[in-house]
């Protein structure tokens, strides 16, 4: 079939890839003649739509494959791009990696949700208080971060009943308000039930921070341990009943297991949200009568490593009796925290590099040691123990070999208690009290330890036994083996192993004497030293300004009472 067109002739069937031929129409055509009183019927509408389609869309210009977007399966780059979402294995792996990073400790995604959603909603609905709303009662205690009182409300509220604990703090008060609000939203069962905190500037002594908690009891773990009846004096209040066991090591071990489980659970809640307490000790652990559990208090020294609140490099806040030997929760080379979004985004990397949560684990290990060994519950004996442990390079096994042959009755009884069930308690204790922070067990891993199982090692399955063996292997100290390998590799550089020392090799090497420094060289060195000093000064100034800005932004979250 021949088709004649103004540009020439084409023999064959019309190509479906080319547009339909447009029929010329005159001005008198019924399509273009329009009168307001005449309506277009359905056939005219269809013809008009078809004409527009052929004019703008249906006109094919180019080769058929270009118009139809067909391609070659061999050369896949010529295939048309898919408009839909294509799921690939690398894409799925990348998405899972990103999600795991965002939810890794201390939690980037939960942190943004907590700061910009939960905190905002909480400020809208939480009750507010003023200093005049309280009737101050007896003084409960006084610490390094403030004075604590037992108070009641001057005007009863319908939804606020009972007694409260009020703390007046001047130093680190803003930090403690921030930490308690974070803990209340993320892990309320780990610490005391925080209600409200505000800044009072009306005092003549200067700005004062007031913090309010619900009253849950006055008993601390330190006070309970000082009793000669410990741990039996805790049995009824923590378990609700007396065990059907005679007084002895097995019954005491059950009570201590329960206390340790609650302490590790509270500590795991803090660490999961990025908070390091840095001052864990029996005096900062209270017993909540309502929940019948131990809770951690006094967050004035805590550091929020999710956004860098209260973290200052080369500065430490601790109690030397319970502090880990490294004294710092992060490497001293770690710089000051940047802005909050950047700090939160980088927090999982810094957490895995430093493992700051192991600092608190060492303190919990010493508390475990005090509960098992009655003679270590006094401050003087604890200080003496720390000195002995330091002389033993913080190796509990070496300390045991040192003191066990001439141990007192209390020490021997403590060793018998931790040796129950195949020594599983001693194994947990040695995994907590270690010199190197990276070799210590985490709070989450400690909760899964067989020590907290009722049947101990006998209740482990095959997979649990394999995991336990892997854990024991990874907790071993391979420093001696590493030193032996390094010494073997450096064999040629030691005179002891038949090689030459570095000094001897330098003497055997022929070399020209060093040139004396001239005036030009000295001037250049002085200029470089001055440049480094200027750069260091500018950097420190910028850090101070940055610290000031950081203090301003998170202080704005604290309510004020003028």
Swiss-Prot record:
It is found in: Plastid, Chloroplast thylakoid membrane. GO terms for biological process: circadian rhythm; photosynthetic acclimation; regulation of photosynthesis, light reaction. Residues 1-45 form a transit peptide. Residues 134-452 form the Protein kinase domain. The modification Phosphothreonine is found at residues 537, 541. The modification Phosphoserine is found at residue 526. It catalyses: L-seryl-[protein] + ATP = O-phospho-L-seryl-[protein] + ADP + H(+); L-threonyl-[protein] + ATP = O-phospho-L-threonyl-[protein] + ADP + H(+). Keywords: ATP-binding, Chloroplast, Kinase, Membrane, Nucleotide-binding, Phosphoprotein, Plastid, Serine/threonine-protein kinase, Thylakoid, Transferase, Transit peptide. Changing residue 167 to R/Q: Loss of function. GO terms for cellular component: chloroplast; chloroplast thylakoid membrane; thylakoid membrane. ATP binds at residues 140-148, 167. Its EC number is 2.7.11.1. PROSITE patterns: PROTEIN_KINASE_ATP, PROTEIN_KINASE_DOM, PROTEIN_KINASE_ST. The active site is at 279 (proton acceptor). SMART domains: S_TKc (SM00220). GO terms for molecular function: ATP binding; protein kinase activity; protein serine kinase activity; protein serine/threonine kinase activity. Phosphorylated. It comes from the Eukaryota. Belongs to the protein kinase superfamily. Ser/Thr protein kinase family. Serine/threonine protein kinase required for state transition by phosphorylating light-harvesting complex II outer antennae (LCHII). State transition plays a central role in response to environmental changes and allows to adjust to changing light conditions via the redistribution of light excitation energy between photosystem II (PSII) and photosystem I (PSI). Phosphorylates the minor light harvesting protein LHCB4.2/CP29 and is involved in the light-dependent phosphorylation of TSP9. Acts as a key component of the long-term response (LTR) signaling pathway. This is Serine/threonine-protein kinase STN7, chloroplastic.
């Amino acid at each position: 079939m021949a088709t004649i067109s103004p540009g020439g002739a084409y023999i064959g069937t019309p190509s479906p890839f080319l547009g339909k031929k447009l029929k010329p129409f005159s001005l008198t055509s019924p399509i273009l003649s329009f009168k307001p009183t005449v309506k277009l019927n359905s056939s005219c509408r269809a013809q008009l739509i078809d004409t527009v389609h052929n004019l703008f869309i249906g006109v094919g210009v180019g080769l058929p494959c270009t118009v139809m977007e067909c391609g070659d399966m061999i050369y896949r780059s010529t295939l048309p791009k898919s408009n839909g979402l294509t799921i690939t294995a690398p894409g799925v792996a990348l998405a899972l990696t990103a999600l795991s990073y965002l939810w890794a400790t201390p939690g980037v995604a939960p942190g943004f949700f907590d700061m910009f959603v939960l905190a905002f909603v909480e400020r809208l609905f939480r009750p507010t208080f003023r200093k005049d709303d309280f009737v101050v009662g007896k003084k409960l205690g006084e610490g390094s971060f403030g004075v604590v009182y037992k108070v009641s409300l001057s005007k009863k509220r319908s939804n606020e009943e009972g007694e409260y604990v009020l703390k007046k703090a001047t130093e680190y008060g803003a930090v403690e308000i921030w930490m308690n609000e974070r803990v209340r939203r993320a892990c309320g069962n780990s610490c005391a039930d925080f209600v409200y905190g505000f800044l009072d500037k009306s005092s003549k002594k200067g700005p004062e921070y007031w913090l309010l908690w619900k009253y849950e009891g006055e008993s601390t773990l330190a006070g309970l341990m000082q009793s000669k009846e410990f741990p039996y004096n805790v049995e009824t209040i923590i378990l609700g009943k007396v065990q059907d066991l005679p007084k002895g090591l097995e019954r005491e071990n059950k009570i201590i297991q329960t206390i340790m489980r609650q302490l590790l659970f509270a500590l795991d809640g803090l660490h999961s949200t990025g908070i390091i307490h840095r001052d864990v000790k029996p005096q900062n652990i209270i017993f909540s009568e309502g929940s019948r559990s131990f809770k951690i208090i006094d967050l004035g020294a805590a550091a929020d490593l999710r956004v860098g609140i209260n973290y200052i490099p080369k500065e430490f806040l601790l109690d030397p009796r319970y502090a880990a030997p490294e004294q710092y929760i992060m490497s001293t080379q770690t710089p000051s925290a940047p802005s909050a979004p950047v700090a939160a985004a980088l927090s999982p990397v810094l957490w895995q590099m430093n493992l700051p949560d192991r600092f608190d684990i060492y303190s919990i290990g010493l508390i475990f040691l005090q509960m098992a060994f009655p003679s270590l519950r006094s401050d003087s004996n604890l200080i003496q123990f720390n000195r002995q442990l330091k002389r033993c390079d913080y190796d509990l096994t070496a300390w045991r070999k040192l003191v066990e042959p001439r141990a007192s009755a209390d020490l021997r009884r403590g060793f018998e208690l931790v040796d129950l069930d195949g020594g599983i308690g001693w194994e947990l204790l040695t995994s907590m009290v270690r010199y190197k922070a990276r070799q210590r067990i985490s709070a989450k891993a400690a909760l899964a330890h067989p020590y907290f199982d009722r049947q101990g090692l006998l209740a482990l399955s095959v997979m649990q036994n394999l995991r336990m063996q892997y854990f024991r292997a990874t907790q071993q100290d391979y420093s001696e083996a590493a030193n032996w390998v390094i010494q073997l590799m450096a064999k040629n550089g030691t005179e002891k192993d038949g090689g030459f020392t570095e000094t001897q090799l330098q003497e055997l090497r022929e070399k020209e004497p060093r040139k004396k420094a001239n005036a030009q060289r000295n001037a250049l060195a002085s200029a470089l030293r001055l440049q480094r000093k200027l750069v260091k000064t500018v950097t420190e100034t910028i850090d101070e300004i940055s610290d000031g800005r950081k203090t301003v932004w998170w202080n704005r979250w604290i309510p004020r009472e003028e």
